[in-house]
Amino acid sequence: MSINIVTLVGRVGTDPDIKYFESGSVKCRLTLAVNRRSKNDKPDWFTLELWDKTAEVAGNYVRKGSLIGVKGSLKFDSWSDRQTGVNRSTPVIRVDQLELLGSKQDRDGGSSDFAPENF
């Protein structure tokens, strides 16, 4: 038996990059900053990949700074470096579930007393 489940909550680092394909599929990529327990630690950054309806929701409602929760799986994108010919790879979270967190005011760029760091 094998399990590949990733659950993250954090702030979006870039506005969603949406691509529409002739097949009708929709792909969205964005970055997510997830804080560590200590405020002195730098956040961990993750690349997220969303498809179809989930990608459309992200494109319509998620912006840089949005607080979101995601559940998905870890995959690796692989390619050959054009200059050196070296095989490279990078981890990507393939998102299956997207949750928009925080208040409407938080999503619209205002401040909120209900931000997770205040709990």
Curated annotation (Swiss-Prot):
PROSITE patterns for this protein: SSB
Domain of life: Bacteria
Any one GO MF annotation of this record: single-stranded DNA binding
One of the record's GO cellular component terms: nucleoid
CDD domains found in the cross-reference section: SSB_OBF (cd04496)
GO biological process, one term: DNA replication
Pfam families referenced in this protein's UniProt entry, alphabetically: SSB
Keywords: DNA-binding
Residue ranges of every copy of the SSB domain listed in the record: 3-102
Assembly: Homotetramer.
Protein name, UniProt field: Single-stranded DNA-binding protein 1
Organism of derivation: Nostoc sp. (strain PCC 7120 / SAG 25.82 / UTEX 2576)
Gene: ssb1
